[in-house]
Amino acid sequence: MQETDLSIIKTFKRLFPIIRNYKWGLIAASVALILNALVDSSLIYLLKPLLDDGFGKADNAFLKQMAILVMLFILLRGVSNYIASYCLSWVSGKVVMTLRRNIFQHLMYMPVSYFDKNPTGRLLSRVTYDTEMVASSSSYVLVTIVREGAYLISLFAVMVYTSWQLSIVLFLLAPIIAFLISIVSKRFRILSRNIQNSMGELTVTTEQMLKGHKVVLSFGGQKVEKARFDRVSNDMRRKGMKIVSADGISDGLVQLIASLALSAVLYVATFPEVMSENLTAGSFTVVFSSMMAMLRPLKSLTSVNSQFQRGMAACQTLFEFLDLKTEKNNGTKQVERAQGCITFDNVIFSYEGKEEQALNQVSFTIPQGKTVALVGRSGSGKSTIASLLTRFYDVNEGQILLDGVNIEEYTLENLREQCSVVSQQVHLFNDTIANNIAYAAKDKYSRAQIIAAAQAAHAMEFIEKLEQGLDTVIGENGASLSGGQRQRLAIARALLRNAPVLVLDEATSALDTESELAIQSALAALQKNKTVLVIAHRLSTIEKADEILVVDQGKIVERGSHEQLLAKGGAYKQLYSMQFSE
């Protein structure tokens, strides 16, 4: 058995337990599908007595009985079809929900480095397109195999029962069709995986345009984005046509073989030995109609392979993602509230896939309740230091201590509970203002505490002007708010959390001077009895810091108070002079 076949079997074995959780829905659907197939084949078999006894003998009473029987069969067919459709939709919906829940949950625990390497659009495609493909393929395959398989078997049984001599021709079909399926299976797997990759690229391209819509408009990039989208879209279309082509060729060959079998039946029927076996008009009609009816299930059972390969390719992608390691979380230490003493001890760090060191032997200590500011040019490593403190990334060498304990010994959840972070890149959720301020902890804080945090961040100034106040839904990422308003909500969120360690990464960069001065006073009150790490571009905001570290090319090149650094006349003095000469 080939390696690809083994991987498909392995993938299906992992998917089966998820489907098995909804076995009663599957059983009900399968029974209904089999019943549906039996009714269809029974309707064909009724042609024999209808032609031989009803019309052949002009028996009106028999014809009336047949009319009632046909009506009952049609009613039974409708009921079974409804049950099968409903149960399969229920199972399919449950499978999609389970897969999406597993993927979404796994995504939330993936390290930040994974998101650095994978575009958001590709991840969205995984949650939406791939999971839907698995569920739809599973439903289609089940319907086809159970209903069409049962229909094919029942039709063959009807044929053998009616005339085994004519039916013997069908035995020639099975090995030929099996051979065709084995040839195209590998091709379908490869093409299906290519389609998935193209769907991911299509989602990425669309997402980039939507997120950067203002940039596109400002720079007149419509033609560039259209060309990019057309290229990706056309690539996906071409790959889709390859699947259609392979599918069509295999279907055509199966139907050609089946047509030859039909011709053979007609030819065999001319032999006296066959005609002498009481082959009536009704019997021949049943056999011929059964063979014609077999074309549909034969075609479906042949094409089910392509759909199965698509589903398994998507499923394989999902399971490969679920097998990726989540954030390293081997620590066991938990504290209710840390004291807040932070030490960086000879920390060396480089981003994955890059040889250049983002931080090189960085060492400093922030005593409990003190404020340390990081300044330097863009890309010098300031934000990297903040990311390492919260373990968004792990150090390559050296260690980071919180209260004398390596931060890797804390559980991730407990470590991050000790830190309130306000970044220059504010993210808000499509929820109320109150829920955004008390994010992930709305039951922990009272309404009064939320209001107090908003007031301290000077956010109530604009919240009170909104019709629904704190209960206003602000849209995706706070689309209805200005940059400064969004930044104030992020500060209010950090104020409410009241963690012993406060990280301010350009926290006031989006505020006007007046608002910044007001919030600086609020932050000054907040910083009492807290350890504060400030990353600042505006040097005027960190003049009162207990210590200022000047970072350049991943190294700390200067350290001291504002006055001490100015007196040195080094890198800090140059930055200060550049800002205040503007």
From Swiss-Prot:
Coiled coil: none
Domain ABC transmembrane type-1, residue spans: 27-310
Stretches assigned to the ABC transporter domain: 342-578
Subcellular location: Cell inner membrane
Gene3D superfamilies named in the record: ABC transporter type 1, transmembrane domain (1.20.1560.10), P-loop containing nucleotide triphosphate hydrolases (3.40.50.300)
Superkingdom in the source lineage: Bacteria
TM helices/strands, residue ranges: 26-46, 68-88, 140-160, 164-184, 252-272
MF-aspect GO terms: ABC-type oligopeptide transporter activity; ATP binding; ATP hydrolysis activity; ATPase-coupled lipid transmembrane transporter activity
Topology term for the membrane: Multi-pass membrane protein
E.C. designation(s): 7.5.2.6
Known catalytic reactions: ATP + H2O + lipid A-core oligosaccharideSide 1 = ADP + phosphate + lipid A-core oligosaccharideSide 2
UniProt keyword annotations, A-Z: ATP-binding, Cell inner membrane, Cell membrane, Lipid transport, Membrane, Nucleotide-binding, Translocase, Transmembrane, Transmembrane helix, Transport
Keyword Cytoplasm carried by entry: no
Family per record: Belongs to the ABC transporter superfamily. Lipid exporter (TC 3.A.1.106) family.
Function of the molecule: Involved in lipopolysaccharide (LPS) biosynthesis. Translocates lipid A-core from the inner to the outer leaflet of the inner membrane. Transmembrane domains (TMD) form a pore in the inner membrane and the ATP-binding domain (NBD) is responsible for energy generation.
Domain comment in the entry: In MsbA the ATP-binding domain (NBD) and the transmembrane domain (TMD) are fused.
Quaternary state and interactors: Homodimer.
Name of the protein in its database record: ATP-dependent lipid A-core flippase
Lineage: Bacteria, Pseudomonadati, Pseudomonadota, Gammaproteobacteria, Pasteurellales
